[in-house]
């Protein structure tokens, strides 16, 4: 793909979220809620393909955060998280996943994970690429996250689950293994 055509496709990308690999998901959620005012937007979801447990946080006027922890203690992700949180990736929304991948590869990126259903995204396709300078990029094809608290919360006098209740909500609805 010619550089100009690749750049035209990439101009349409929109930064969607920041992915942070954490050592302990529950603790990290509490930290971001307490120190920075984020609210938990989803119940934790286990991504069986990538072997991580994921939760999204939101804050008015800020990009969403995707916090995730490794579920396999000896995985490369678990080893990377042992010293604490790590900026793992920037995620971009695209409506042309294949074209975006082709464009990025033509400009020197390397595919780490080809398109596959993203369990935290209601199985809409996602892909991961290494773009150089130690940075990974996730490409997402939907802005709808699985396990949104507003949709998953039990009825409670017309309100949604409070951020402090989100981890309890996961336990009450039987965990997040039913993916």
Give names to the regions the model predicted:
Residues 60-80:
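A contiguous binding-surface segment within folded domains or other stable secondary-structure elements
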Residues 36-46, 107-116:
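Short secondary-structure junctions
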Residues 28-33, 104:
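Conserved active-site tyrosine of GNAT-family acetyltransferases
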């Amino acid at each position: 793909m010619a550089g100009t055509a690749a750049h035209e496709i990439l101009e349409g990308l929109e930064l969607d979220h920041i992915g942070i690999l954490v050592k302990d998901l529950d603790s990290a959620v509490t930290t971001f809620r307490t120190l920075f005012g984020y609210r938990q937007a989803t119940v934790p979801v286990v991504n069986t393909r990538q072997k991580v447990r994921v939760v999204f946080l939101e804050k008015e006027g800020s990009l969403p955060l995707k916090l995730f922890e490794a579920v396999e203690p000896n995985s490369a992700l678990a080893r990377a998280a042992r010293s604490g949180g790590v900026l793992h990736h920037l995620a971009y929304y695209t409506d042309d996943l294949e074209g975006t991948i082709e464009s990025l590869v033509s400009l020197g990126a390397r595919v780490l994970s080809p398109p596959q259903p993203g369990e935290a995204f209601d199985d809409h396709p996602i892909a991961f690429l290494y773009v150089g300078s130690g940075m990974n990029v996730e490409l997402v094809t939907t802005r709808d996250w699985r396990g949104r608290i507003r949709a998953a919360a039990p009825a409670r006098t017309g309100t949604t689950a409070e951020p402090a209740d989100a981890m309890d909500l996961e336990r009450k609805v039987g965990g997040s293994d039913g993916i």
